[in-house]
Amino acid sequence: MNFSESERLQQLSNEYILGGVNSPSRSYKAVGGGAPVVMKEGHGAYLYDVDGNKFIDYLQAYGPIITGHAHPHITKAIQEQAAKGVLFGTPTELEIEFSKKLRDAIPSLEKIRFVNSGTEAVMTTIRVARAYTKRNKIIKFAGSYHGHSDLVLVAAGSGPSQLGSPDSAGVPESVAREVITVPFNDINAYKEAIEFWGDEIAAVLVEPIVGNFGMVMPQPGFLEEVNEISHNNGTLVIYDEVITAFRFHYGAAQDLLGVIPDLTAFGKIVGGGLPIGGYGGRQDIMEQVAPLGPAYQAGTMAGNPLSMKAGIALLEVLEQDGVYEKLDSLGQQLEEGLLKLIEKHNITATINRIYGSLTLYFTDEKVTHYDQVEHSDGEAFGKFFKLMLNQGINLAPSKFEAWFLTTEHTEEDIQQTLKAADYAFSQMK
């Protein structure tokens, strides 16, 4: 493929935009470098770049675009609302309608508040949990990404009894001292952290199904034990469902798994492609939030009518019969096809799939925790990424990310993807 216009625009971008991208995950640094492809438009399962190349898209904006690009029903809703006004700074009926649809789908959201991103949603749930418990420390799991606020950019200490250290420049040591990081799926490490820190722990922050070091399921009983241990300690359980809400079924992962948290953060999919975030949970906890309580959260754009209208339209598409069955079927076809090709070409790789989402890891062991992904073969992934890109298959440029299917992918897309993977694997020996 020819990428000359993307390369020209990237050089121009570097003159004005720091690093040439507005999010570091969009650069190709993790896959060997080079100018990232500059996209021009998207329709359904496909993206089209500035050089006229067409791609089958499995990036899907890192997860939000579950109904494909420019879905007619959502696009129409956005256009209709834009003609009426996009921001009023007042309550609207759309906020009420959208909140009701969300609570009908996710019953644990007894009360809801909207923000503008997943980062804001998680950041605020932590503040609310601290206000409710009157404690300061939180526990998070290694490898899970919860946005870029200071408190969650903290790396693990040497063990469950050790405090974390800043995972980014600009995060104060004083902030990192409020965070304990333990391995996902390691209930003994979690018990040790709770036993050591006791009544200092306000909340534990959990991705019920991990989406940020690929797709990783909790081990049987893990989430149930986290709930029990936490509540026995007076610690709140916060689920980060920014990726997982409405990804696997019409609702949240918590309902699919049958384990209910105290608070939930959500975003991505529910905005229909527009900026959104939100959080909710038990009424008695949520009543800590202003104007009813002392925990402050506000936002000029929070609950704006454009995002509310897009979210309502998105849920109207997803609540139709057969949507998630199709995603699961396509995911199964893609997984089975890739596994056959891995065997055919004797590639050291494994796959985690959860319904219509999967991750291909270049490692010889089944992935259940972050360290396995950290030590997987990033060089092999980078080569695979470039070989697929040059055949019109758009993946996330990182070994840690997932492939996302949409309602608009077809069996023909799967077959074309497998054909490209067959060639890519053949060039990796």
Curated annotation (Swiss-Prot):
It is found in: Cytoplasm. Its cofactor is pyridoxal 5'-phosphate. Its main location: cytoplasm. Gene3D superfamilies: Aspartate Aminotransferase, domain 1, Type I PLP-dependent aspartate aminotransferase-like (Major domain). It comes from Staphylococcus aureus (strain MSSA476). This is Glutamate-1-semialdehyde 2,1-aminomutase 2. The keyword Cytoplasm applies. It comes from the Bacteria. InterPro entries: 4pyrrol_synth_GluAld_NH2Trfase, Aminotrans_3, Aminotrans_3_PPA_site, PyrdxlP-dep_Trfase, PyrdxlP-dep_Trfase_major, PyrdxlP-dep_Trfase_small. NCBIfam families: hemL (TIGR00713), PRK00062.1 (NF000818), PRK12389.1 (NF009055). GO terms for biological process: protoporphyrinogen IX biosynthetic process.
